[in-house]
């Protein structure tokens, strides 16, 4: 979503935009979020770090354990989402660069109906929407990573033609 905000504001500096795990719901309006004081800075837990791995058999337990171990060491504080009302600026019609929309089939954050609306509202005809079969929100680390990489490179090659 940050990439989309940057693309909308500075399209002259962006060649194309890839959206993956895109959670925005069509016509959803974030309430004004003007927090006061310091963010809560809650610690990241092992359960939270592993929460994106939803589909059995798409990644080994050893890989999940290593991901969790490194996540806890590299980022011990959980993300504090603040000023979320700024996402109300997001509008597919304001994206003028080519877009690759990647959706994992079982990503609980990325809803097909919302993606359909987003894709329809993109004004640039240089756009592709790829659904990664048998994948969830962590597809770039799972068995679907090859398809994710192939879709990304195919999109880049397609733009060069």
Residue ranges and their predicted role:
Residues 1-27:
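Conserved hydrolase catalytic core segment
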Residues 19-73:
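Hydrolase active-site cap/lid region
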Residues 26, 73-91:
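Active-site nucleophile elbow and catalytic-triad environment of alpha/beta-hydrolase enzymes
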Residues 88, 97, 111-120:
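Short alpha-helix in the alpha/beta-hydrolase fold that links the catalytic acid
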Residues 95, 101-103, 107:
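Short beta-strand/loop motif that positions the catalytic acidic residue
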Residues 106-110, 138-139:
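Acidic catalytic loop of the alpha/beta-hydrolase fold
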Residues 128-161:
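Catalytic active-site module of serine/aspartate enzymes centered on a nucleophile-bearing elbow/loop
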């Amino acid at each position: 979503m940050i990439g989309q905000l940057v693309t909308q504001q500075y399209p002259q500096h962006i060649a194309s935009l890839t959206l993956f795990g895109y959670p925005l719901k069509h016509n959803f309006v974030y309430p004004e979020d003007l927090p006061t004081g310091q963010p809560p800075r809650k610690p990241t837990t092992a359960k939270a770090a592993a929460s994106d791995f939803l589909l059995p058999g798409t990644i080994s337990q050893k890989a999940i354990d290593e991901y969790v171990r490194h996540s806890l060491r590299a980022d011990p504080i959980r993300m504090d989402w603040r000023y979320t009302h700024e996402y109300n600026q997001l509008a597919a019609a304001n994206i003028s660069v080519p877009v690759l929309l990647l959706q994992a089939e079982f990503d609980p954050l990325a809803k097909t109906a919302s993606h359909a609306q987003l894709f329809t509202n993109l004004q640039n005809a240089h756009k592709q929407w790829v659904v990664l079969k048998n994948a969830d929100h962590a597809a770039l680390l799972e068995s679907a990573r090859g398809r994710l990489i192939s879709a990304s490179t195919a999109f880049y090659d397609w733009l060069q033609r």
